[in-house]
Design a protein with these regions (language model features):
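Positively charged n-region of N-terminal signal peptides that target proteins for export
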Residues: 1-4
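Active-site helix/loop module of the DD-peptidase/beta-lactamase fold
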Residues: 27-30, 82-85, 98-144, 197-234
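C-terminal segment of classical bacterial N-terminal signal peptides
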Residues: 14-21
Length: 491
């Protein structure tokens, strides 16, 4: 009887150990991560954040901020966000699946599927037989954000993907195909259209039937309307004058394969575990193509030590895999450490968060290292700079305007000297030049005005306007400045 009791006790302990594994993340680490997110939400203009961590067999979720500030709906692991360019890994998997199934080869020329597509380089047509599907997969086609980002049309009709790629016909390439890597989001729109041509299905239907369902990604959506129906879709915000404001960005349905898949932290955790080979209940062919998707294109130079795979940036031995994404009112970051079976995903509903800082800080917390002081995102800093400039130039413009107006009413002005006429002429010319430069400013950053108004903070526009107003006001101030009479010595 005693032996039986000992055996029962041992088995009970083993069973309990199996059911309740030791927590990989300590309570103090959890508190530090939550504090990090709360601080980030507050300093980034009340941004909503949803974080998922895979650490071995454990999945931990953290959240902070609001999915909708007006209704005070908090962010949870179920909250849906636009994945932005993290969407590319899904599209990359889809195109590799078609290759695995024998429908295409990534070495096929693009004209095999889109015979009407043609490009030019330095004004001359290029041999389209030399442009393969791999060029689009690895961003070596010559289509880049610098030249082709603003070509993405707005709209949500069923043919927007076709319209988006048709807009690339006869595009001027930034470099000859296969010569170098340079990121261009439209490359994955081309792949999305190839999926439609090969399967005779919409991109959305193919991805839902052949990728999301087999992988059991049940909270991942391709249509904004479907996501809204769940009641879990986060409201997007954009930076504006030291805060974030609600922003309903235009529809870019033609850019869906590159940047507009929608998901939540629960599905992203499963997605990361699938990427690291921790999920067994998926078709075997996915295991093969996922491994293939992590192979970076080493035929061109690395970008900061990373090569581009199929929707992923990877180092040479695939021990570090990541991708980020930014839409007008959402941003994301996913980082995988396959050798450590650790991965982190961050979803946010504004562009004010420095996502890679959060990911690095979480990694430091998990490794027991100190974290760096809070670092703002580039977009947040842009808004701070231009908002500050707007205030300064507006105040100065009003000040000089009021002084000049008072002098105008008092007729407090003497005859204008030739010297002052030269100064006024120079200031007037400067005002005109600044006004012209403000009008063409988007060209300097690779945008047009329509694109700039969608993607950049409104404070950028007001800063340019207030600078022009300041120059005009200061010119009038000099015009109205009273002439100083020369001092005459008394006898």
């Amino acid at each position: 009887m005693k032996k039986i009791w000992v055996i029962f006790t041992v088995l009970s302990i083993l069973a309990a150990t199996h059911i309740s594994p030791v927590q990989a993340i300590s309570e103090s680490q959890s508190e530090a991560i939550q504090e990090l997110l709360d601080e980030t939400s507050k300093k980034s203009g009340e941004t909503g954040l949803s974080l998922s961590i895979v650490d071995g067999d454990e999945v931990i979720y953290f959240s902070s901020g609001y999915a909708n500030r007006k209704t005070e709906e908090p962010v949870t692991k179920d909250t849906l966000f636009e994945l932005a360019s993290v969407s590319k890994a899904f599209t990359g998997l889809g195109i590799l699946l078609l290759e695995e199934q024998g429908f295409l080869s990534m070495t096929d020329p693009i004209q095999t599927y889109l015979p009407w597509l043609s490009f030019e380089y330095e004004g001359s047509p290029i041999d389209m037989q030399s442009v393969t599907l791999n060029n689009f997969l690895h961003h070596t086609s010559g289509l880049t954000n610098e030249l082709h980002f603003q070509d993405i049309p707005q709209g949500n009709s069923q043919d927007m993907l076709l319209k988006t790629v048709e807009g690339l016909k006869t595009s001027q390439l930034q470099f000859l195909p296969s010569q170098q890597y340079q990121y261009g989001t439209v490359n994955y729109d081309v792949l999305g259209l190839v999926i439609e041509v090969v399967t005779n299905k919409s991109y959305e239907r193919f991805m839902s039937d052949e990728v999301f369902q087999p992988l059991d990604l049940n909270d991942t959506y391709l249509y904004q309307a479907d996501a809204q129906e769940t009641g879990q879709m986060a409201k997007g915000y954009r930076p504006s004058f030291f805060m974030t404001i609600p922003y309903g960005a235009p529809d870019f349905a033609g850019n869906k394969p590159a940047g507009y898949i929608i998901s939540n932290s629960k599905d992203m955790a499963r997605w990361m575990k699938i990427q690291m080979g921790q999920i067994e209940d998926i078709p075997d062919n996915f295991k093969r193509i996922i491994e293939k998707s992590h192979k970076g294109n080493e035929s061109v130079s690395a970008d900061d030590g990373l090569y581009y795979g199929a929707g992923w940036l990877v180092n040479s031995d695939a021990s570090y895999i990541e991708h980020d994404g930014v839409n007008p009112n959402f941003s994301t970051q996913v980082v995988l450490f396959p050798e450590d079976l650790r991965a982190v995903s961050l979803l946010t509903n504004s562009t004010n968060v420095n996502n890679i800082y959060i990911i690095d800080s979480v990694q430091n917390i998990l490794e027991g290292k100190p974290i760096e002081p809070y670092q703002r995102s580039g977009m947040h800093l842009t808004d701070i700079i231009f908002s500050s400039a707007t205030i300064i130039f507006t105040v100065l413009a009003l000040l000089f305007f009021m002084i000049s107006l008072r002098r105008e009413r008092n007729n407090n002005q003497n005859r204008i000297s030739k010297k002052r006429k030269v100064v006024i002429g120079g200031l007037l010319a400067l005002t005109i030049i600044i006004a012209i430069l403000s009008l063409i400013y988007p060209m300097f950053i690779g945008y047009d005005w329509q694109t700039l108004l969608v993607w950049q903070p409104y404070s950028l526009v007001t800063a340019l306007l207030s600078l022009t107003a300041f120059c005009a006001s200061f010119t009038w101030y000099i015009w109205k400045y009273p002439k100083i009479k020369p001092y005459k010595k008394s006898n």
